[in-house]
């Protein structure tokens, strides 16, 4: 992407909207399946009063509460949640839940669930598999949990009880063989011919 201005002058912001096409050479092995830079995205949420849950999958660590997901206090029943599409189908291995900067407004508990939308309906609550049961978390803390998951996941649901903010959420795992093959093809097809010539050894076979 190249921006040209004539003859000069300033630009406050430039937004280019689309879907991330990650370089598959960085997706081989254990990666953050949820990261926006790898193609993860927010697809549903209950509340984004102060800040969107899309923030918690952005690169790097948050520098303040405004760079995480900050929801409003709930006055009724229920709990807040966010649903994400993973970069591709993969097997989750461990998760990091970061409540840094959230001191008086961190969740009391969190829960994680996953689903493989290739063979199940994400609108069917009974089709989701629990990755992390409802677990107490501390304010202003980075929590890490090892997951025991047999199958692949494509979507992740985060539930916070009853509400509360997070700085970041990382879901580390391995893409399945077909997902990695599809990622290679998508990336290759998105390259201009002049770029393909520079990485000819990466052409899908």
Q: What kind of feature is each model-predicted range?
A:
Residues 1-32, 151-178:
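Hydrophobic, ordered structural segments
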Residues 1-9, 79, 86-90, 128-166:
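Beta-sandwich interaction modules
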Residues 9, 100-108:
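Extended, low-complexity, turn-rich repeat/linker tracts enriched in Gly/Pro/Ser/Thr and Asp/Glu
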Residues 17-87, 103-105, 175-205:
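Disordered, acidic Ser/Thr/Pro-rich linker "stalks" and the adjacent N-terminal cap
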Residues 21, 116-121:
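Short loop/turn segments immediately following beta-strands, especially the blade-tip
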Residues 55-74, 121-147:
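Intrinsic, low-complexity N-terminal interaction/targeting segments
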Residues 110-112:
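Short beta-strand elements bearing conserved aromatic residues within extracellular beta-rich modules
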């Amino acid at each position: 992407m190249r921006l040209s201005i004539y003859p000069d002058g300033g630009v406050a912001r430039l937004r280019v909207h689309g879907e991330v096409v990650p370089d598959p050479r960085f997706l081989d092995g254990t990666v953050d399946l949820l990261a926006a830079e790898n193609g993860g995205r927010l697809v549903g949420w209950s509340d984004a009063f102060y800040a969107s849950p899309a923030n918690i999958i952005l690169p790097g660590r948050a520098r303040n509460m405004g760079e995480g997901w900050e929801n409003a206090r709930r006055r009724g029943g229920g709990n807040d949640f966010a649903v994400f599409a993973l970069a591709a189908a993969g097997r989750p291995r461990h998760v990091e839940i970061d409540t840094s900067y959230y001191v008086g407004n961190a969740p009391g508990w969190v829960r994680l669930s996953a689903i493989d939308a290739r063979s199940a309906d994400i609108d069917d609550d009974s089709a989701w598999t629990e990755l992390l049961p409802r677990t107490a978390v501390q304010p202003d803390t980075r929590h890490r949990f090892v997951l025991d998951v047999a199958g692949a996941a494509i979507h992740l649901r985060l539930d916070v009880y009853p509400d509360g903010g997070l700085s970041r959420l990382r879901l580390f795992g391995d893409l399945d063989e077909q997902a990695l093959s599809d990622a290679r093809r998508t990336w290759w097809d998105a390259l201009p011919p002049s770029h393909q010539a520079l990485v000819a050894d990466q052409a899908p076979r």
